[in-house]
Amino acid sequence: MIAGIKQSKKALEASKVKLAYVANDADENVIKPFLHLCKKKAVEVNRELDMKELAKLCKIEVPTAVAVVTISNVVEI
């Protein structure tokens, strides 16, 4: 899992993202280009968590607006 908009965007541009998390309390001006790129790359976006919950999911202390699950993190069953 990658946290942070810059690193998440790089992974998305490289087509390595399976699922994107965008915090529901993130600044829309900040995440709008990222959401557009998710749509362009046909990546599902989950907006159920806020920035603090997303940080907890990523096991980091600083709230984050964006995180992604990369293809290498996904195990098919």
Where in this protein do the model-derived segments appear?
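Short, flexible, solvent-exposed loop/turn segments with mixed acidic/basic and small polar residues
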Residues: 9-11, 33-34, 56-58
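Feature captures the catalytic cores and cofactor-binding loops of soluble hydro-lyases/lyases
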Residues: 26-52
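Short basic, glycine-rich beta-strand/loop surfaces that mediate nucleic-acid
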Residues: 43-77
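General secondary-structure edge motif
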Residues: 17-18, 34
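Alpha-helical transmembrane segments of helical membrane proteins, especially in multi-pass transport
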Residues: 21-22
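Aromatic-enriched hydrophobic runs in primary sequence
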Residues: 3, 31-36, 60, 72-74
